Amino acid sequence: MDCSTTIIVLNSKLSESYMNNKTIRILKEAALLYETKDFLLKDPALFMHIPKEKHDKEVMAFIASCMSYGRRELFFPKIQNILDCSKTKLVQWILSGNYEHDIPDNEQSFYRLYTNHIMNRFLYRLKQLLITYGSLEKFAAYYAPDHKAITLIKAFCSYFNEVGQTHIIPKNTQSSCKRLCMFLRWMVRKDSPVDLGLWNDIIDQRTLIIPLDTHVIQEANRLGLIKTKSTSMKVACELTEKLRKIFPEDPLKGDFALFGYGINN
């Protein structure tokens, strides 16, 4: 499913029917107010800023995004544990197989529905990716020659499910793939105090898709941007298209805007 083929681009006259000047002003002001370094203090994006090396930042971002569900006070310590075990050298920790010592291959709970076995197999598949392609960045460049976010999301879904790993990375893009969309926001958006922007030359940030969850859905509905409470890639693309009307060169600035609107209201 590709945003460019599933979303009908509305003309400017129709745009005015779902987005008035007040809504546009509210979202632009909220984006400016909340996309700051302080945002990192309570966001899992914080962890990817800790490693010094570029490819360690990539791996930390990928793992942190995959772990980011549920209550932050519960999953933050789990991400911190991985950072501590690796001593911030994520690539070396995975390639050396040291993760197998720190996260033994058993059925004990690691975090919520993720057992140690699930995490172990996930990290093993990530290890295979790093061995085969050299880095997450090179994987992205290889699988997204069209520079589109949806192409790379599909590639991640396919790669991590080739060997039956279906618990952490979605099987396909029927779901909203929230955590993969969030990971790509982190990696692609440039000139941000929050996002790294390391892959801005690989993925066109105009093709990024909003990480869709119940909170985003709620605020988007309150503003009249969408009229559904379901989460799917189709809905994520629809909302992203609306945000692109406000932020043409950087639609995921709207992610901060909706967050800020929710806080303010």
List the model feature ranges, each with a label.
Residues L14-N265:
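HhH-family (HhH-GPD) DNA N-glycosylase catalytic core used in base-excision repair
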